[in-house]
C-alpha cells in the first residue's frame, strides 16, 4: 500500500494504473474505518475495479458550527491495518491545506435538499460533502 499525502502523487499513481489497463476504484472516507467502509472496497472489487484508492480526510467543511471537529475519532494505525488486509493500492491522506489551498475557493450548493433530514440540523454539511467529493473525483 502506497501512502501519499499530495494530489500530485495520487494523480501519478492513478495515471500509471490506468496506463496499465487498470480500473480504478475510489472509496472516500473520513477514517476511523468500519465494516461499511471495507464493504465499499469489496463492492468496487466485485464491480470490476482492480486498483484501489482510499482517501482518509476529516473534512472540516462537513462539521456544523456546534460540532467538534477536534473530537472526531481517529486511529490511523488501525485504519492502515484494515486497509492492508483489503490489499488497497493507494491511501491518500491529504492535509486541510492540500484540499483547501488559501488561493483557491471551490463551493458547491446542494440546494434545498441540503436543508432537509440531516441538513436541517447541520447547516452546510451536505455542501461540504459535495465539495470534497468533487475534489476527490477531480
Predicted features by range, described:
Residues 1-138:
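Nucleotidyltransferase catalytic core that binds NTPs
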Amino acid at each position: 500500500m502506497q501512502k501519499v499525502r499530495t494530489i500530485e502523487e495520487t494523480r501519478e499513481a492513478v495515471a500509471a494504473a490506468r496506463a496499465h489497463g487498470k480500473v480504478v476504484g475510489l472509496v472516500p472516507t473520513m477514517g476511523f474505518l468500519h465494516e461499511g467502509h471495507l464493504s465499499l472496497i469489496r463492492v468496487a472489487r466485485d464491480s470490476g475495479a482492480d486498483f484501489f484508492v482510499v482517501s482518509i480526510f476529516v473534512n472540516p467543511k462537513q462539521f456544523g458550527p456546534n460540532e467538534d471537529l477536534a473530537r472526531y475519532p481517529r486511529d490511523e494505525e488501525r485504519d492502515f491495518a484494515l486497509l492492508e488486509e483489503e490489499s488497497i493500492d493507494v491511501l491518500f491522506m491529504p492535509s486541510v491545506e492540500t484540499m483547501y489551498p488559501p488561493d483557491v475557493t471551490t463551493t458547491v450548493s446542494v440546494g434545498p435538499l441540503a436543508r432537509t433530514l440531516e441538513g436541517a440540523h447541520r447547516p452546510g454539511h451536505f455542501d461540504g460533502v459535495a465539495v470534497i467529493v468533487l475534489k476527490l473525483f477531480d
